[in-house]
């Protein structure tokens, strides 16, 4: 449920009005009825009566319909990474501030710092285009399980199975989109037991309309992220544009505001304890069916390792950002992306332990084993499921640390490493000569301009040295790449293992360490030059070691885990035929529902279902950027007149939780 009144002009009311946004808290799904993330086309069969019992005054057809306008037509997949909602007949779209953070950062500069000061387009001409950002509407969902499964058999390896699924999925997608401007994807559900085709209409002209300053949109920062109570004005506005005939089109001044099939009405009455709430959106991923073996690996290895690496990355970025205003803008989105799941993994580990998830998973698995053992047919069909999963995790235990470091510290660590890896592939694929080669080089230059716009050599050099050092001291030496022997045998440096010295020399010699050097390289590019480049040689040494030593084991893990999970999930559904199951999130549309309610996280701990502006003032800390409060907001607070946005007690509510 969302409350919004968009400011029409820059006046005294602007700050007051954008503070009136209130959005449902997402962190406490345990409070949601049946804790489900339900596929919208199945709501009528599975959930309609229960939703109405909780207070829904609509039908399932009102929520999801292929032939008529419904709520699904107001829900948008923003760029494939966030959810947004249509809130007007003129293409206006609401999303989270953190979802628009990349766009806000992209348009910010030292002279126009929209991250710090916020941004409001006072006319359509002032709205800011965002190249590459899309807005996709779900057109329809169709169950194609029977068609896909008909092409599969039990004699197939998992690799053969995946190849056949890709083949038949392409055929299904081609048939579904032929003669239309739609795009589609076949997605697997329940561990590869069910398959649905999702058809979308995707718009490519999405313009930024408004966003509050980060002191409101990110109030509380990492400290309050994934926590309650919170007091964050986490919202931003875009507008979708289309061709005059209403079809998707690339950015053009000739485009017009899109008129959606449906948009969500806005109400300003607020919510009360017990009110029905519903979240409609595109959640990325969940692991509801993770076994005890997966929980143990997360707690023992991957979660803490990820947190440790991101701790270091965040610390290095923060030093650079605090030292220079331009660097602060350059790294704002990178810092936010890194910190979001840094905090998530901290909270997840805490939750897994406090809720004794491992023990609960073991109990489910014991029940499953007993059920399978009761019947020879079940033993034949499902008997190997948990054994395969256990075997996979035993193998993965030996390589999980290496794989986590490869992803977090190498490919997502110092940017110069992955950039060199990516550019080598781009240069290798260049046409030999002629117009096509020039066009391809221009495309590389365009991408490079975007990359170096938000790149700071000093920060990245620190990351390069630190990530290599963490890798060296934490990954088993038996899994070390040859590059670490080179670092050990350096002739110079201020200590025996001087990663700073290695980084300094690598950056001094690399063509990727500055825009100037890279564009000089592009005057006569060659893969031979890249293959001698120290940044590229570093990442390839680590990557090749992984491929040679780890990838075979990883392939075995993948095969066993994929098959084991598929059988285990199928068996669970057969074991409990009367239970309603929902599939893990996979960036497809889902609905979850419940009621507004107070939060009781522990003994003698109680929080109201809403927060107010009083909490903002209580949290204010002028010495902590996360809790800075804008002067204008403090002035409004002192006056205390919130007009139509005041609750029954005359206060201004900020967030609520369900």
Task: Kindly give the residue locations of the regions a language model identified.
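Terminal presequence/propeptide segments associated with secretion/organelle targeting
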Residues: 2, 15-18, 22, 29-658
């Amino acid at each position: 449920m969302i409350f919004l009144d968009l400011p029409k002009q820059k006046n005294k009311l602007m700050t007051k009005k954008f503070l009136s946004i209130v959005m449902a808290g997402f962190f406490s799904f345990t409070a949601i009825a049946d804790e489900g993330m339900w596929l919208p086309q199945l709501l009528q069969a599975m959930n309609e009566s229960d939703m109405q019992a909780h207070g829904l005054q609509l039908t399932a057809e009102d929520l999801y319909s292929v032939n008529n306008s419904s709520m699904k037509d107001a829900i948008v997949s923003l760029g494939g990474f966030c959810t947004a909602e249509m809130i007007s007949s003129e293409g206006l779209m609401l999303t989270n501030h953190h979802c628009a953070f990349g766009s806000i950062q992209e348009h910010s500069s030292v002279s126009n710092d929209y991250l710090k000061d916020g941004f409001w387009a006072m006319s359509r001409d002032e709205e800011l285009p965002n190249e590459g950002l899309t807005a996709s509407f779900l057109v329809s969902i169709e169950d194609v399980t029977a068609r896909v499964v008909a092409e599969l058999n039990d004699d197939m390896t998992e690799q053969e199975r995946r190849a056949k699924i890709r083949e038949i999925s392409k055929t299904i997608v081609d048939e579904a989109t032929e003669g239309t401007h739609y795009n589609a994807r076949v997605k697997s559900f329940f561990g590869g037991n069910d398959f649905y085709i999702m058809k979308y209409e995707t718009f490519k002209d999405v313009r930024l309309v408004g966003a509050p300053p980060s002191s409101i949109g990110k109030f509380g920062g990492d400290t309050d992220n994934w926590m309650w109570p919170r007091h964050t004005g986490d919202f931003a506005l875009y507008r979708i544009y289309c061709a005059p005939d209403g079809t998707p089109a690339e950015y053009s001044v000739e485009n017009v505001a899109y008129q959606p099939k449906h948009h969500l009405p806005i109400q300003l009455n607020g919510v009360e304890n017990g009110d029905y709430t519903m979240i409609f959106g595109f959640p990325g991923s969940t692991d509801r069916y993770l076994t005890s073996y997966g929980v143990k690996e997360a707690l023992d290895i991957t979660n803490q390792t990820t947190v440790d690496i991101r701790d270091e990355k965040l610390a290095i970025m923060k030093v650079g950002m605090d030292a220079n205003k331009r660097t602060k803008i350059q790294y704002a989105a990178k810092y936010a992306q890194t910190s979001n799941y840094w905090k998530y993994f901290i909270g997840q580990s805490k939750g897994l332990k406090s809720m004794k998830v491992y023990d609960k998973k073991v109990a489910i698995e014991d029940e499953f084993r007993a059920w399978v053992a009761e019947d020879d047919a079940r033993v034949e069909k499902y008997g190997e499921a948990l054994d395969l999963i256990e075997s996979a995790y035993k193998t993965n235990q030996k390589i999980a640390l290496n794989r986590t470091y490869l992803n977090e510290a190498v490919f997502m660590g110092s940017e110069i490493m992955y950039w060199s890896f990516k550019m080598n592939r781009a240069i290798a694929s260049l046409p030999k000569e002629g117009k096509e080669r020039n066009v391809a080089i221009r495309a590389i230059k365009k991408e490079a301009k975007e990359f170096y716009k938000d790149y700071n050599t000093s920060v990245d050099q620190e990351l390069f040295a630190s990530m290599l050092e963490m890798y060296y001291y934490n990954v088993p030496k038996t899994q070390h790449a040859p590059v670490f022997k080179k670092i050990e045998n350096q002739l110079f440096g201020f200590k025996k293992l001087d990663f700073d010295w290695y980084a300094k020399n690598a950056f001094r010699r690399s063509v990727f360490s500055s825009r100037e050097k890279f564009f000089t390289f592009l005057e006569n590019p060659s893969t031979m030059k890249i293959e001698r480049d120290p940044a590229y040689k570093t990442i390839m040494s680590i990557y090749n070691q992984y491929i040679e030593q780890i990838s075979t084991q990883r392939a075995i893990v993948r095969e066993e885990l994929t098959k084991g999970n598929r059988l285990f999930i199928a068996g669970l559904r057969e074991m409990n035929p009367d239970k309603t199951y929902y599939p893990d999130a996979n960036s497809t549309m889902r609905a979850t529902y419940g009621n507004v309610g107070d939060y009781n996280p522990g003994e003698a701990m109680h929080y109201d279902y809403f927060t107010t502006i009083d909490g903002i003032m209580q949290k204010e800390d002028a010495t902590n950027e996360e809790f800075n409060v804008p002067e204008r907001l403090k002035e409004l607070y002192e006056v205390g007149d919130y007009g139509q946005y005041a609750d029954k007690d005359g206060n201004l509510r900020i967030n609520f939780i369900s």
